[in-house]
A protein has these predicted regions:
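Terminal-appendage/accessory-domain detector
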Residues: 81-94, 101-215
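N-terminal core-entry segment
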Residues: 1-136, 176
Length: 215
């Protein structure tokens, strides 16, 4: 469609603002950890809606349709049973795109979680507070929940100069969800990424957890 670089960047911001805000509302409403595939449906619908020039009613339609069809993607199932399902991102994007196309075709949707009164505060900051500014690139190629002990091991090795062979035991103190990450020797890349013992061991031996350590 001849989208300019400025319009592309603006649309990217729209995607993140919609995804994060809808994600916060959805997470609170259902009281269990959803994954990024769920929120990606909102972000994709909002982004495509902007590129297609949707008005307010059309955008609300697309977001409602996206919510009704978004993947459930329970986070802890990915943690307990690592596989290529991971966070359901591909189908979240597909649902968001289909929601925009359905809106163009005349399908309607009414209401979505972010519109509920208890989440009004998430809408009131639109245009003044940007959630995209709270994002970053993950430094290690594994679940974010394992990053704190990885960083701690790397920093300690730099500070005290010990060799991997000097380490006999490692005790990790972390939050409950992170303790449910796998602690076995992985046989697949997915098992290596949804793990806590393996990445920590890699950080001690290699000083990093990148692509070579999880393949």
């Amino acid at each position: 469609q001849g989208v300019t670089y400025k319009e592309y960047l603006t649309t990217l911001v729209v995607c993140y603002e919609a995804a994060v805000r809808c994600g916060l509302a959805t997470q609170d409403f259902y009281k269990f950890l959803h994954s990024t595939g769920t929120y990606g449906a909102f972000g994709t619908a909002a982004g495509m809606g902007r590129l297609l020039g949707f008005n307010k009613e059309q955008l609300n339609n697309a977001l409602s349709i996206a919510e009704f069809h978004a993947p459930i993607t329970p986070v802890m199932r990915s943690v307990h049973y690592p596989s290529m399902n991971k966070d359901g991102v591909p189908f979240g994007v597909l649902v968001g795109a289909e929601a925009a196309l359905e809106t163009l075709a005349g399908s309607t949707g009414r209401g979505y979680t972010l519109e509920l009164p208890e989440y009004r505060h998430l809408l009131e900051t639109l245009g003044s507070t940007y959630e995209i500014m709270n994002l970053y690139f993950k430094p290690y190629t594994c679940c974010r929940w394992a990053h704190q002990p990885i960083t701690a091991c790397i920093d300690l090795a730099k500070e005290y100069g010990y060799a991997p062979t000097d380490v006999k035991h490692v005790y990790v103190h972390t939050f409950d969800s992170a303790t449910q990450l796998s602690k076995i020797v992985p046989h697949t890349a997915d098992e290596a990424q949804y793990n806590i013992a393996w990445p920590v061991a890699c950080s001690i031996v290699h000083g990093d957890v990148g692509l070579p350590q999880v393949l």
